[in-house]
């Protein structure tokens, strides 16, 4: 038994859990992240490798989806061109709240080596980004670590106040 563990039991010796609704909702959200895989260049290959059995993102509750309406996390992997910028914004707007964005790779973060008239110099100029993954191309382990950081970030947020739900006064 752990040092500070307290075992509460109710009428008949059944264990009970003491927590808040906010923590319960955030635990559920953080452990069932459905990601929109939005691969634009080389980083998409590493993102696809992360969905294979070797890295097994399913054990963290991360499932890749093709529809933005079924996703909470958008992973943008690769170079974003100005031609794709409006489409990227539209996909982001179609995602339900709450939503998070991971910018994967140097090209998505800052435009990378493609400093041209047709390249967006960072995804954060189009949509808000929560986590930046550096590298060319980041390994699947790095993406896995970023998802674990995102899970911690989600658990720290309030489930209801972030969406504008106000407390009712009696």
UniProtKB/Swiss-Prot annotation:
Query: What biological process terms from GO does the record include?
Result: aerobic respiration; electron transport coupled proton transport
GO MF terms listed in the record are: 4 iron, 4 sulfur cluster binding; iron ion binding; NADH dehydrogenase (ubiquinone) activity; NADH:ubiquinone reductase (non-electrogenic) activity; quinone binding
Its record classes its membrane topology as: Peripheral membrane protein
Q: What is its EC number?
A: 7.1.1.-
Enumerate the UniProt keywords alphabetically: 4Fe-4S, Cell inner membrane, Cell membrane, Iron, Iron-sulfur, Membrane, Metal-binding, NAD, Quinone, Translocase, Transport, Ubiquinone
Q: Which cofactor does it need?
A: [4Fe-4S] cluster
Q: What is its main location?
A: membrane
Highest taxon of source: Bacteria
Question: Does the entry feature the keyword 4Fe-4S, yes or no?
Answer: yes
* Catalytic activity annotation: a quinone + NADH + 5 H(+)(in) = a quinol + NAD(+) + 4 H(+)(out)
Binding residues for [4Fe-4S] cluster, per the UniProt record?
Answer: 42-43, 107, 136
Top-tier EC class: translocase
Query: Which compartments does it reside in?
Result: Cell inner membrane
Matching InterPro entries: NADH_UbQ_OxRdtase-like_20kDa (IPR006137), NADH_UQ_OxRdtase_20Kd_su (IPR006138)
User: What's in the GO CC field?
Assistant: plasma membrane; respiratory chain complex I
Quote the function comment for this protein: NDH-1 shuttles electrons from NADH, via FMN and iron-sulfur (Fe-S) centers, to quinones in the respiratory chain. The immediate electron acceptor for the enzyme in this species is believed to be ubiquinone. Couples the redox reaction to proton translocation (for every two electrons transferred, four hydrogen ions are translocated across the cytoplasmic membrane), and thus conserves the redox energy in a proton gradient.
What does the sequence similarity comment in the record state about its family?
Belongs to the complex I 20 kDa subunit family.
**Oligomeric state and partners?**
NDH-1 is composed of 14 different subunits. Subunits NuoB, C, D, E, F, and G constitute the peripheral sector of the complex.
* NCBIfam families named in the record: nuoB_fam, PRK06411.1
Which named protein is this? NADH-quinone oxidoreductase subunit B
**UniProt organism field:** Campylobacter curvus (strain 525.92)
């Amino acid at each position: 038994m752990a040092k500070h563990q307290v075992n509460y039991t109710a009428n008949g010796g059944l264990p009970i859990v003491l927590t808040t609704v906010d923590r319960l909702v955030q635990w559920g959200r953080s452990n069932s992240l459905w990601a929109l895989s939005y691969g634009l260049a080389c980083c998409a290959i590493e993102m696809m490798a992360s969905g294979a059995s070797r890295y097994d993102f399913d054990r963290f509750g991360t499932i890749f989806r093709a529809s933005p309406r079924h996703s909470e996390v958008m992973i943008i992997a690769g170079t974003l061109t100005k031609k794709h910028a409006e489409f990227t914004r539209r996909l982001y707007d179609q995602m339900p709240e709450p939503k998070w964005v991971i910018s994967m790779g140097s090209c998505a973060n800052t435009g990378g080596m493609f400093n041209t008239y047709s390249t967006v110099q960072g995804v954060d100029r189009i949509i808000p980004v929560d986590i930046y993954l550096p590298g060319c191309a980041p390994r699947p382990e790095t993406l896995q670590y970023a998802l674990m950081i995102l899970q911690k970030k989600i658990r720290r947020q309030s489930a209801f106040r972030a969406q504008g739900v106000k407390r009712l006064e009696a």
